[in-house]
Regions:
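Short, well-ordered beta-strand segments
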Residues: 40, 57-59
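Catalytic core of pol beta-like nucleotidyltransferases
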Residues: 1-38, 46-52, 62-110
Length: 110
C-alpha cells in the first residue's frame, strides 16, 4: 500500500503517459484492493487537452459499492496528484457519457 502526503491538486499536472504509467504501476492494488476489472481514462487527459486546473476522468468496471468507489477516488487522487472523477460502467449509464467514454477512452487496465 502506498503512503501519501497531502497534495495541492492544482500544481501537479502530468502528461497522459505519466498518468497511465502511475496507474499501470498500481494495477495489482487496484484489482485486489478495489475489485477493479477494467479502467479507462477519458476526457481532456485522454485527448491531450488537459490544463493546470483539469481533473482526471476515469471509468471503471467494478462492483457497485459506494464505499469502495469513495476509497478508489481518494486513492487515485493521491496517486495522480490531482482531482479525479470516477464513474462506474453500468448498463443504465447516460448515453452521452457512454458515447464520450467509448470515443475517447483509453484502456489502462483491461
Amino acid at each position: 500500500m502506498l503512503c501519501f502526503k497531502e497534495i495541492d491538486y492544482f500544481c501537479n499536472m502530468k502528461t497522459k503517459s505519466e498518468y497511465i504509467e502511475l496507474i499501470e504501476n498500481q494495477e495489482d492494488e487496484l484489482r485486489r484492493g478495489f475489485g477493479v476489472r477494467s479502467l479507462r481514462l477519458f476526457g481532456s487527459v485522454s485527448r491531450d487537452e488537459q490544463t493546470e486546473g483539469s481533473d482526471v476522468d476515469v471509468c471503471v468496471e467494478m462492483e457497485p459499492q459506494a464505499y469502495l468507489m469513495v476509497r478508489l477516488k481518494r486513492f487515485l487522487e493521491r496517486l495522480l496528484g490531482c482531482s479525479v472523477d470516477v464513474v462506474r460502467m453500468h448498463k443504465h449509464m447516460n448515453p452521452y457519457l457512454l458515447q464520450e467514454i467509448n470515443r475517447d477512452g483509453i484502456y489502462v487496465i483491461k
